[in-house]
Each structure stands twice: as C-alpha cells, then as structure tokens.
Amino acid sequence: RGLGDVYKRQRENVLTNPDAELDILLTHKHGDHILGIPSLLKSGKVRRTYIHPDDQEGLLSSMQKFFGLTAEDLKLVNIVDGDTVRIGSEELEVVDVPGHTKGSVVFFYKDYIFTGDAVGSGDLFMMEAATDTYLPGLEHFMAEVLLRNEDVDYELLTGHWENLNPFSVEYLRHMLILVKGVIRGDIPIGYYTRKPGRWAGYLDANIFYPYAVFSYENEK
C-alpha cells in the first residue's frame, strides 16, 4: 500500500529473498493504497496485480491518469469473494466486504486478516455505502471468521497508521454492534471533530461519513 519507493522499502526491510518475484494484492482502489504500484512495476519482478472487478475501473483511471499505465502493464487479475490467491506455497482467501468502496475485499492468511480499509483502522471512512447497505457485507465477514475456526483469535492488519497494533476479532464485533445500533437508531449520530462530516462510535469502533448518507432509514 501507500506512496514513495515501495519496492526499495520492501527489498531492504521485508524481502528475505531480494530477488523474489512479486504479486500485488489490492484491498481496494484508493490512491493511498495503489500509488506505490509503479515503483513495484519498475522492479520488473511483478507477476500479477489482483483487484476486485468493482474497483478495477477506479484503479485503472488513476494508473492511466498519473502514470500512463494500462491493465496489461499491471498484469491485472480480478478476484471475487471465495477466490484463493496462491503465492508460491502460500494461499490467501478472498472475502468481499463492500462499503468503504464497492469492491473492498479482505484477505485471510493463516491467523491474520489483511483488511485494508474495509473495517477501518479505528475510524471507518464510508465512501460508497450507507450503514444499511454495509451491514450484509460486514455480517458476511464475521460469518467467514467464525466458519473457519471459532477458537482462532485472528489479528486484523488494517490499512492505516492511527493504530499500529493489530486489532482482534473483538473490534469486528464492536463494529457490528455499532452498525446495527445506528440502523436501529440506538446509537446517536454526531459530528466528526477532525474534519467535516458525521460520526458514530461504539467502544473502539467508529464510522465517519464525509458526504454519503449515514443510514437510509435515518435520513428519511
């Protein structure tokens, strides 16, 4: 994710084999998660770039506008709910969680879940859905967590710096309570203090709407 010379940072600090080939797995289309792609492509090591089809147009629009890159340059592959991405001997499972963007996904890997911005990093910025339409995907996400193993306390590796420590499944439960409470009207909607917009919170879970309606029911 992110900006700058991503490949150099990965090569120097992450890769155990500095000459390894790379696959890029995108959780969604937003610039702060995709604008490091050209740095990776310049390495000549990228085999494939994975993204959900509902976010593909936004990705390609940004890549073409800022870097002149096409789907062929990115070696683009679509992924959807239920897919498995194989990287060497490792496998990551794809689960759709639309809301932050229409094509937001999370990746299950062993005891970890890479969530991007699908459930926020303490603050969930809802860009393309009200809570009413976000809830089914969030419930699906929780069901997938429980389906795999109720005894595993997954670490949720989120996409932003506000909280550097991993979240647990408890955070996901709090987000579910928050979304359901907003829809029912049990949890009040206020105003965000960091920038213009509307906000609601429950324990460590918060939802922020910069411009979309918060809840279709509550806006009627």
What is the predicted function of each stretch?
Residues R1, R86-I87, F108:
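Generic beta-strand structural signal
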Residues R1, T16, Y171-H174, R198, ...:
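Zn-dependent metallo-beta-lactamase
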Residues G2-Y7:
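Short, small-residue-biased leader/transition segments that mark boundaries at the very start
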Residues R9-E12, P136:
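Short, contiguous clusters of charged residues that form electrostatic/catalytic patches at enzyme active sites
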Residues R11-R86, G181-R184:
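Active-site HxH/HxHxD metal-binding segment of metal-dependent hydrolases
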Residues E91-P98, K102-I183:
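Metallo-beta-lactamase
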Residues L172, V179-Y192, W199-G201:
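Metal-dependent nuclease catalytic regions and adjoining charged, substrate-binding loops involved
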Residues G190-K220:
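C-terminal regulatory/interaction regions
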